From Swiss-Prot:
GO terms for biological process: cell division; cell wall organization; peptidoglycan biosynthetic process; regulation of cell shape; UDP-N-acetylgalactosamine biosynthetic process. GO terms for cellular component: cytoplasm. UDP-N-acetyl-alpha-D-glucosamine binds at residues 92, 304, 326. It comes from the Bacteria. InterPro entries: Enolpyruvate_Tfrase_dom (IPR001986), Enolpyruvate_Tfrase_sf (IPR036968), MurA_subfamily (IPR050068), RNA3'P_cycl/enolpyr_Trfase_a/b (IPR013792), UDP_GlcNAc_COvinyl_MurA (IPR005750). It catalyses: phosphoenolpyruvate + UDP-N-acetyl-alpha-D-glucosamine = UDP-N-acetyl-3-O-(1-carboxyvinyl)-alpha-D-glucosamine + phosphate. The lineage of its organism: Bacteria, Pseudomonadati, Thermodesulfobacteriota, Desulfobacteria, Desulfobacterales. Cell wall formation. Adds enolpyruvyl to UDP-N-acetylglucosamine. Disulfide bonds: none annotated. This is UDP-N-acetylglucosamine 1-carboxyvinyltransferase. The gene is murA. GO terms for molecular function: UDP-N-acetylglucosamine 1-carboxyvinyltransferase activity.
Length: 417
């Protein structure tokens, strides 16, 4: 099993290019199932989760060709309505094929998902939404069985905004008869990116980026050629790295309009931030100031940046309070950070972080995707050597992370048995 070894204490400087957003690419690739031709996507990151969705689409009958960051999906031959456990178990986002299959084939049999250790992440929202659009739903032997000769428009309301739920039901509603309204919809940029793609395909969707989305169903959708938006979480990870190491990093192929919650908080820590079009420069301050953070749905501070920001606060001056409101069990990384000398106390969904003079390198184990990134960041600022195991989590969501850090001056390497 691969490990990453980091020698800490180096100031990071230079330029890094941000990859395409995994969380935008996954639903957009799944939306290919709604067309009867070849879609072309550029700026697609080369990640384990992307490979998983490509394997699943191939199993369903799609033909996929890849060249660099370009992926072509020919969905004209899709005729298989079953997504089996051996494929779905690799990644929770595999549930994104459920609604496109029902919309296109009239039925779907999709294994209940796996792939992430963060809380329960229920799919109830997806199923209730499909039922509201006329689908028959049954849970049998670990599978979701959904069928509807033709989906019809319905009224859907989320008790809590669900990104994947919103995306799945958008794809169902795009080909449904009549009008569908989604209330308390997720507003994340990845949702808006999917809507942009669906509308380019010929869908009629309004309200993306707001809590109220209206979809007027159309008879069919056409193939498109589109580029995947930049990854705002990867961007945030490098911004934190600059502040953490008191470095000077220029980040290209970014989308600052997606980063307000992160940019505001980072500026409060004392980092100097310059934004010029799609380029962000972050210069770390002499002192890292402690700030409080509460994770919230977009445009609030993203839960996917909580672990990385906690590392920054672990070496800040003073006490910071980090409140996690999106997922339960998202402080799994704390025990590993404490092994490195971080002073963190957990109470329910709140972490109290007392800034320490320094962190110390130690053997640590990654528990999920963003926890993996936080441990790499901790290793960059720690005294001595940090050895991170179970880094396969990292490969699910970061493209060539250690190589990018190495080009910025970090002493970091991957060790393969």
């Amino acid at each position: 099993m691969d490990r990453i070894i980091v020698e800490g204490g180096r100031r990071l400087t230079g330029t890094v290019e941000i990859s395409g957003a995994k969380n935008a690419a996954l639903p957009i690739l799944a939306s290919s199932l709604l067309t009867n031709g070849t879609c072309t996507y550029t700026n697609v990151p080369d990640l384990r989760d992307i490979q998983s969705i490509k394997e699943l689409l191939t199993h369903l009958g799609a033909k996929i060709e890849c060249q660099g960051t370009t992926v072509q999906v020919d969905a004209s031959g899709v005729n298989n309505h079953e997504a089996p456990y051996e494929l779905v178990r690799k990644m929770r986002a595999s549930i994104l094929v459920l609604c496109p299959l029902v919309a296109r084939l009239g039925r779907a049999r999709v294994s209940l998902p796996g792939g992430c250790a963060i809380g329960e992440r229920p799919i109830d929202f997806h199923l209730k939404g499909l039922e509201a659009m006329g689908a028959d739903i049954a849970l049998e032997h670990g599978y979701v069985n959904a069928s509807a000769p033709k989906l019809t428009g319905g009224s859907i309301y989320f008790d809590v905004p669900s990104v994947t739920g919103t995306e799945n039901l958008l794809m169902a509603a795009a080909l449904a008869d009549g009008t569908t309204r989604i209330g308390n919809a997720a507003c994340e940029p990845e949702v808006t990116a999917l809507v942009d793609v669906l509308n380019q395909m010929g869908a009629n969707i309004t309200g993306a980026g707001t809590p109220e989305i209206t979809i007027q169903g159309v008879p069919s959708l056409n193939p498109v050629s589109v580029s995947i938006i930049p990854d705002r979480i990867e961007t945030g990870t490098f911004m934190v790295a600059a502040a953490l190491t008191k470095g000077d990093i220029t980040i290209t192929n970014a989308e600052p309009s997606h980063l307000k919650g992160q940019l505001d908080k980072l500026a409060q820590t004392g980092a100097r931030i310059e934004v010029n079009g799609k380029v962000i420069r972050v210069v770390g301050g002499d002192t890292i100031k402690s700030v409080d953070v509460k994770t919230l749905p977009y445009p609030g501070f993203p839960t996917d940046m909580q672990a990385q920001f906690m590392v920054l606060m672990s070496v800040a001056s003073g006490l910071s309070i980090i409140t996690e409101t999106i997922f339960e069990n998202r402080f799994i990384h704390v025990s590993e950070l404490k092994r490195m000398g971080a002073d963190i106390t957990i109470s329910g969904n709140t972490a109290m972080v007392a800034g320490a003079p320094k962190l110390s390198g130690a053997p640590v184990m990654a528990s999920d995707l963003r926890a993996s990134a936080s441990l790499v960041l901790a290793g960059l600022v720690a005294d001595g050597t940090t050895e991170i195991s179970r880094v396969y989590h990292l490969d699910r969501g970061y493209e060539n992370l250690e190589e990018k850090f190495e080009r910025l001056g970090a002493s970091i390497r991957r060790v393969t048995p």
